[in-house]
């Protein structure tokens, strides 16, 4: 649903706006890197749960049991590949020619890779990455963020401490907005609605707005309980492939890629969350990054 990615960017731009942005260091790729057709992001019943499959270029090709007139019709290929028939009329996935990608409509379709190269679209990026399969360069190449490459300044220590303040407030506001729009849209589950209802009806809730970090810090201290569920909820939205209590680089992509051009501390923040440097962020690490106390971290809140 294209409306969701627009909704995400608008909210992020208003609630997470930071002075400058940060350049991303090269990262060792643990899993096949993320990939997204930004304008074609799929969503499930809950629009905040961006389907990570749209960002994952490492999924295996699968073939449906139903036999169609065109064998390629039900043969799925991962991003960067297209289906072709071999001499036996058997479907197979081959690298897509980048020149066959649709012409980009505008700047918003461009993406930046981690080697600081701008591609006309995610289609062009993945098609190029496919041609490098099996090489060291191809293994390390990944989609860094949405939009053309730009200078992203370093994230200062003082700025890093401000990031979770804005992020927490943003997560709370996203949930409240979804709750207000959820009459017949199934944007939230019934269990989620019960949790968010308490936040929505709390008269002490800080309304959405461009607040100074001092106010955000005071609000978190005074209304701490209001932020516990939003932090757990976002973890659950990202922990999808597989649902194992850990966030991989791929699973972080739906949240991370749109934010990097606007929030220059995004990458450094998520790196600091990985306390044991195993390239995965566990629930304890995630919640701790947002200031949630150990006694309040509860896997049963990931609903």
UniProtKB/Swiss-Prot annotation:
The keyword Protein transport does not apply. It is found in: Secreted, Extracellular space, Extracellular matrix, Basement membrane. Residues 261-296 form the EF-hand domain. Disulfide bonds join 72-83, 77-93, 95-130, 101-123, 112-149, 155-265, 273-289. This is SPARC. Ca(2+) binds at residues 274, 276, 278, 280, 285. GO terms for biological process: negative regulation of angiogenesis; negative regulation of endothelial cell proliferation; positive regulation of endothelial cell migration; regulation of cell morphogenesis; regulation of synapse organization; semicircular canal morphogenesis. It comes from the Eukaryota. Residues 71-93 form the Follistatin-like domain. SMART domains: FOLN, KAZAL. InterPro entries: EF-hand-dom_pair (IPR011992), EF_Hand_1_Ca_BS (IPR018247), Fol_N (IPR003645), Follistatin/Osteonectin_EGF (IPR015369), Kazal_dom (IPR002350), Kazal_dom_sf (IPR036058), Osteonectin_CS (IPR001999), SPARC/Testican_Ca-bd-dom (IPR019577). Residues 89-151 form the Kazal-like domain. GO terms for cellular component: basement membrane; cell surface; collagen-containing extracellular matrix; cytoplasm; endocytic vesicle lumen; extracellular region; extracellular space; intracellular membrane-bounded organelle. It is linked to Osteogenesis imperfecta 17: An autosomal recessive form of osteogenesis imperfecta, a disorder of bone formation characterized by low bone mass, bone fragility and susceptibility to fractures after minimal trauma. Disease severity ranges from very mild forms without fractures to intrauterine fractures and perinatal lethality. Extraskeletal manifestations, which affect a variable number of patients, are dentinogenesis imperfecta, hearing loss, and blue sclerae. Appears to regulate cell growth through interactions with the extracellular matrix and cytokines. Binds calcium and copper, several types of collagen, albumin, thrombospondin, PDGF and cell membranes. There are two calcium binding sites; an acidic domain that binds 5 to 8 Ca(2+) with a low affinity and an EF-hand loop that binds a Ca(2+) ion with a high affinity. GO terms for molecular function: calcium ion binding; collagen binding; extracellular matrix binding. Glycans are attached at residue 116. Residues 1-17 form the signal peptide. Changing residue 259 to A: Loss of collagen binding. Belongs to the SPARC family.
């Amino acid at each position: 649903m294209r409306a969701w990615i627009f909704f995400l960017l608008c909210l992020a731009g208003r609630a997470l706006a930071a002075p400058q942005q940060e350049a991303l260091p090269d990262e060792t790729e643990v899993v096949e890197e993320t990939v997204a057709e930004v304008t074609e992001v799929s969503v499930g019943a809950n629009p905040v749960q961006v389907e990570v499959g749209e960002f994952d270029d490492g999924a295996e090709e699968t073939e449906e049991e139903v036999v169609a007139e065109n064998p390629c019709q039900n043969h799925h290929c991962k991003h960067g590949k297209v289906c072709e028939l071999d001499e036996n009329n058997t479907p197979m996935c081959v690298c897509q020619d980048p020149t066959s990608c649709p012409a980009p409509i505008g700047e918003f379709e461009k993406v930046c890779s981690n080697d600081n190269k701008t591609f006309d679209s995610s289609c062009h990026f993945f098609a190029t990455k496919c041609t490098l399969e099996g090489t060291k360069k191809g293994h390390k190449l990944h989609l860094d963020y949405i939009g053309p490459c730009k200078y992203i300044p370093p994230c200062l220590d003082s700025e890093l401490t401000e990031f979770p303040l804005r992020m927490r407030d943003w997560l709370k506001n996203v949930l409240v907005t979804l709750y207000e729009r959820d009459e017949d849209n199934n944007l939230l589950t019934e269990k989620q609605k019960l949790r968010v209802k308490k936040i929505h009806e709390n008269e002490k809730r800080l309304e959405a707005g461009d607040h100074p970090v001092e106010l955000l810090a005071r609000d978190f201290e005074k209304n701490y309980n209001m932020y516990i569920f939003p932090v757990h909820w976002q973890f659950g939205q990202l922990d999808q492939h597989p649902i194992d209590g850990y966030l991989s680089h791929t699973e972080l992509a739906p949240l991370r890629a749109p934010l990097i051009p606007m929030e220059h501390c995004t990458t450094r923040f998520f790196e600091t969350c990985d306390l044991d440097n195993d390239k995965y962020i566990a629930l304890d690490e995630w919640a701790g990054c947002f200031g949630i106390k150990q006694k309040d971290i509860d896997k049963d809140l990931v609903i």
